[in-house]
Amino acid sequence: MREWFKLSHPEGSGFFYAPTGGKMNRVNTKTMIRTRDMTKIGMLSVIGFILMYFQLPLSFVAPPFMKLDISDLPVLMGAFTMGPVFGIIIAALKNILALIFKGTMTAGVGELSNFIISSTFAFVASYIYRNHRTYKGAIIALTAGVISMTILAMASNYLVVFPLYAKVMPMDAIIAMGSAITPKITGLFTMMIYSVLPFNLIKGFTTSAVMMLVYKKISPLFKN
């Protein structure tokens, strides 16, 4: 089967020689690779940060502080073209940029949640795709990434993120926001089931759909 996506990050390092003035000058290609990768990481991190400004509230399923965006798209792009670890780095940098330039209304809790979810999505999807580089493999990889990030989102929000939110806003007020969406939300656990779960599925599959549409056109810019 033909390859649909292509992981093109070079592995290892070596040397080549270029003649100058009758002499052979050794150039460390590992340094060149690192410089090129840092440039790509910087570009994708900035794009991800900019996309965080374009948010869509999902008032039918999520409280006001949970909004849909596609800022995970550059994270996925980096993970698929350079490797899973690079996706995690880009996810971290885009949230650091958001904290510095955009500020936070959640004392950094929202950015922490975004990093956990974004990096999990990119890592799982790109790791699976490395061994299944076909169109079908891409769909399977992205679906696995969405499911993984949704499960982790529920666990991290239940155990860490929402308890931290409660230090900024009373937990009763947070639950009340959920209850206004559906009376089925009566506590933190039901908030995870009826709000966090569908929200992350919608976000993940929306980002995946955009990724499938634009990857082949945009990825050459980030390949070697």
Residue ranges and their predicted role:
Residues R2-F5, S13-N224:
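Loop-helix junctions at membrane interfaces
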